């Protein structure tokens, strides 16, 4: 009962706390800030509220949210300033006049993914500036006064992918500044960079997808060779890198220069001549040169438009240079009055390059709100506004645009023909919006478009022929959307070199009509998709493996079925992916036809099978030989053990005569039939030991107490039982039989051992035979052994033996014995010495 009451009280308190939390969050949204829920994320808009510290704001504790603090008075961020903001995923601190961020200011923001510090007065990024932001993926710090970055400033931001540092005062980058981050986008435009080394900087951004280096005073000398070499090896979007110095390369694009242009090999004879010629040019130009040619930045407190009057590329025809001199080379167009929309910042490189209009985060809801219209805009940045629809007439007066940035808005609708007038547009950013469907008329008029960014939308469908009008399209980012499939021939009319399909919902991707339409040497990112590694993915596997150049940026990782989850597609065998299908090695193989002027086409051609190589790899050969050797050793060892066991299975007689047990032997009769055995050195015939104990009931084997000699003297007869008589007796499990046979004296004298030498060859078949069973006894161990001389003296007197053996079957003839000793009892009793001599002689046989 008490436990139930306790449980109810706990639930009540939890409910009250949750209600209070909701009430507090509601009060914040109602009184201090404007709150709006979008995509299950709460947007807390606290812009221009005059906050001097964020400790005055109490955020909700049980919901994730985006916090907008733009346009406040947060000039300094103190330690633990955001300790209560653990559920914030996005934090906007732009236009606050922020000058200092102290150590631990961002502690508590463990889930923060995007941080915006743009349009402030920061001068340095220290190693401890971003402590606590382990989950940060997007950092925007453009339009500040940043002139120095410490080497470990980004070392804790292991998940950082996008870094925006454009329009600052950076002279150089410290070594290993990007060592611990995996950047995909880096913006360094509008700084004061002259060189960029490979060691310590470029070597750590190998996974970069976009790097912008425009509007820097690049020093195109031998020091720029590492950057030039790096640019020649990548295919990512870089932007225009224009030389500022030396004089001879002023205004040239670095990507169009050769190594000889950057670092010429001058001989001693003409080096002085070229030097004096260059000095003459400089002296002639100096009186008339506009100071604006030297890129400088006005004090950023007032933030006036940045003027970078970069000269137009000079004429390369030597005749013109000699006729008109350098004044003609650097002559620019007549000044044109520049107009800039209110609430925007406009900069210009030169009158012929147009105007850069920066209207980021100005709360515009429509593009038509930009008044007055800018004059000849070259680049228009409308990032981070509240645009929801791009109307058909919004961009009619922006035909000179080269770049249009509409990212991070709320655009869900683009009316048909909205971009028709943008015939010169090369870069279009539509990332971070709410687009769901792409259709062909959406991109009408963009025949010059080269770079299209559509990542981080909610795109679920792309209509056929959507990109057909984009004949110059080179880069297409569709990552982080909801795509499950692509229509046939979707990329047929493009010239793509970079395609990003990362983090969508693709389980399969057909080759025919999709991948086979991609041009040569394309880089494609297919990672973070739920790939289903079954038979349907074999086309994609073949396409990736038969490509002539490495086109896959990241590996294709299987998500299903469960047995292949987490495995890389290219490491899976065909049988593992599709075990029930026929052998695919004899099936369809993708053939690739390359042409320098035409896109690569992947076609299915039965006659264009790849050449089959029958050579066995060395590693496989060595492994096979090793297996054969091991099997041979095992087989030989088994055969040896088998033979050894067979040999041990043959019975043998011990060689030690003192420990010999009588086993079996055969006695030669006049007529006999018996089994044969090989004679050994320790055969039983060498000697017959005295009997040991009473082993059977036959009297002849019964040893009586007292003198054993008297026993032999009283022995009256030998017992013999014929087969016929045995038949009359009742059957018993065992019975005893003894036999005595006198050995006839040999016709010729010979050794006793020769008696049984060829006994195996003298087998004769008896006329009739009967089956007789024998039970024998083991004789006692003899107490002494006579000498050899004694045995020799009594050898001729041996005339009988006693047969002992193990139980065995044999055939005994029923013929009547002829020896007188077998017909009656002995005529006389044996003498003791005679018995002893006989026993001694027999024991030596």
UniProtKB/Swiss-Prot annotation:
**Residues of this chain annotated as glycosylated in UniProt:** 84, 421
**Which intervals of the chain are annotated as region Required for interaction with PTPRD?**
167-215
Variant or mutagenesis effect after changing residue 9 to I: Found in a patient with a neurodevelopmental disorder; uncertain significance; does not affect surface expression; does not affect function in synaptogenesis
Signal peptide annotation: 1-21
- Compositional bias segments (type: Polar residues): 283-293
Question: Where in this chain does the record put each LRRCT domain?
Answer: 216-265, 529-580
Which stretches of this protein does UniProt put in the Extracellular compartment? 22-621
Q: In which tissues is it expressed?
A: Expressed predominantly in the cerebral cortex of the brain but also at low levels in the spinal cord and medulla. Also expressed in some astrocytic brain tumors such as astrocytomas, oligodendrogliomas, glioblastomas, gangliogliomas and primitive neuroectodermal tumors.
Membrane topology term reads:
Single-pass type I membrane protein
| Annotated ranges, domain LRRNT | 331-373
State what changing residue 549 to F does. Answer: Found in a patient with schizophrenia; uncertain significance; does not impair synaptogenesis; no effect on localization to cell membrane
* Mutagenesis / variant outcome for changing residue 89 to M: Found in a patient with schizophrenia; uncertain significance; does not impair synaptogenesis; no effect on localization to cell membrane
**Full protein name:** SLIT and NTRK-like protein 2
User: Taxonomy-wise, where does this protein's organism fall, top ranks first?
Assistant: Eukaryota, Metazoa, Chordata, Craniata, Vertebrata
């Amino acid at each position: 009962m008490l436990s139930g009451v306790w449980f109810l009280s706990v639930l009540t308190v939890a409910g009250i706390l949750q209600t209070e939390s909701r009430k507090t969050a509601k009060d914040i949204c109602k009184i201090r800030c404007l709150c709006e829920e979008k995509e299950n994320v709460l947007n807390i808009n606290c812009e221009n509220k005059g906050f001097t510290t964020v400790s005055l704001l109490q955020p909700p504790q049980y919901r994730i949210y985006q916090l907008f603090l733009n346009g406040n008075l947060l000039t300094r961020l103190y330690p633990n300033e955001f300790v209560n903001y653990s559920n914030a995923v996005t934090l906007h601190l732009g236009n606050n006049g922020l000058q200092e961020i102290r150590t631990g200011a961002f502690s508590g923001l463990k889930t923060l993914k995007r941080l915006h510090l743009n349009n402030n007065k920061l001068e340095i990024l220290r190693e401890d500036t971003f402590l606590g932001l382990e989950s940060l993926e997007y950092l925007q710090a453009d339009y500040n006064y940043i002139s120095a970055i410490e080497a470990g400033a980004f070392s804790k931001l292991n998940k950082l992918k996008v870094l925006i540092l454009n329009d600052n005062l950076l002279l150089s980058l410290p070594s290993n500044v990007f060592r611990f981050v995996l950047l995909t986008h880096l913006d360094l435009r509008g700084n004061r960079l002259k060189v960029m080394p490979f060691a310590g900087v470029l070597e750590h951004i190998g996974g970069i997808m976009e790097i912008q280096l425009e509007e820097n005073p690049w020093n195109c000398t031998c020091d720029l060779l590492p950057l030039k070499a790096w640019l020649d090896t990548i295919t990512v979007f870089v932007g225009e890198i224009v030389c500022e110095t030396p004089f001879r390369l002023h205004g040239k694009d670095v990507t169009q220069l050769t190594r000889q242009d950057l670092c010429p090999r001058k001989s001693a004879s003409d080096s002085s001549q070229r030097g004096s010629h260059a000095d003459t040019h400089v002296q002639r130009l100096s009186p008339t040169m506009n100071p604006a040619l030297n890129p400088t930045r006005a004090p950023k407190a007032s933030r006036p438009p940045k003027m970078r009057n970069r000269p137009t590329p000079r004429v390369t025809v030597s005749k013109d240079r000699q006729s008109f001199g350098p004044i003609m080379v650097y002559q620019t167009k007549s000044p044109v009055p520049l107009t800039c929309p209110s609430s925007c910042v406009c900069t210009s490189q030169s009158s012929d390059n147009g105007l850069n209009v920066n209207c980021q985060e100005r709360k515009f809801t429509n593009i038509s709100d930009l008044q007055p219209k800018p004059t000849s805009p070259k680049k228009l940045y409308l990032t981070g506004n509240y645009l929801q629809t791009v109307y058909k007439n919004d961009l009619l007066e922006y035909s000179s645009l080269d770049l249009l940035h509409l990212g991070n808005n709320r655009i869900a609708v683009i009316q048909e023909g909205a971009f028709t007038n943008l015939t010169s547009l090369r870069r279009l950013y539509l990332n971070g919006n709410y687009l769901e469907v792409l259709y062909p008329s959406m991109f009408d008029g963009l025949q010059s478009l080269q770079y299209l960014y559509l990542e981080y939308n909610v795109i679920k469908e792309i209509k056929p022929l959507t990109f057909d009008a984009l004949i110059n399209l080179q880069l297409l980012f569709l990552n982080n959307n909801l795509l499950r499939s692509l229509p046939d021939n979707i990329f047929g009319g493009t010239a793509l070199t970079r395609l990003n399909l990362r983090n969508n919902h693709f389980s399969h991707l057909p080759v025919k009509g999709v991948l086979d339409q991609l041009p040569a040497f394309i880089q494609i990112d297919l990672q973070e998709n739920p790939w289903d590694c079954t038979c349907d993915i074999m086309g994609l596997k073949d396409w990736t493996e038969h490509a002539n150049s490495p086109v896959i940026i990241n590996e294709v990782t299987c998500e299903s079925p469960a047995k292949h989850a987490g495995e890389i597609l290219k490491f899976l065998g065909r049988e593992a992916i599709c075990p029930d299908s026929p052998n695919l090695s004899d099936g369809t193989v993708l053939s690739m036809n390359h042409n320098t002027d035409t896109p690569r086409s992947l076609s299915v051609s039965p006659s264009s099978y790849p050449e089959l190589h029958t050579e066995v790899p060395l590693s496989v050969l060595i492994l096979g030989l090793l297996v054969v050797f091991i099997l041979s050793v095992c087989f030989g060892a088994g055969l040896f053990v088998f033979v050894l066991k067979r040999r041990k299975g043959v019975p043998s007689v011990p060689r030690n005569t003192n420990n010999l047990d009588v086993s079996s032997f055969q006695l030669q009769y006049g007529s006999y039939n018996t089994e044969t055995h090989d004679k050994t050195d320790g055969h039983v015939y060498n000697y017959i030991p005295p009997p040991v104990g009473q082993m059977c009931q036959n009297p002849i084997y019964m040893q009586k107490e007292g003198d054993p000699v008297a026993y032999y003297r009283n022995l009256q007869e030998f017992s013999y039982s014929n087969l016929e008589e045995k038949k009359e007796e009742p059957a018993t499990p065992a019975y005893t039989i003894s036999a005595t046979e006198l050995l006839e004296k040999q016709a010729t004298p010979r050794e006793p051992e020769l008696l049984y030498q060829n006994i195996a060859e003298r087998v004769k078949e008896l006329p009739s035979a009967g089956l007789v069973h024998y039970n024998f006894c083991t004789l006692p161990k003899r107490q002494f052994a006579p000498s050899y001389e004694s045995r020799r003296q009594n050898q001729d007197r041996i005339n009988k033996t006693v047969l002992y053996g193990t139980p065995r079957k044999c055939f005994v003839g029923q013929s009547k014995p002829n020896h007188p000793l077998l017909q009656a009892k002995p005529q006389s009793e044996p003498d003791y010495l005679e018995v002893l001599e006989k026993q001694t002689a027999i024991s030596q046989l």
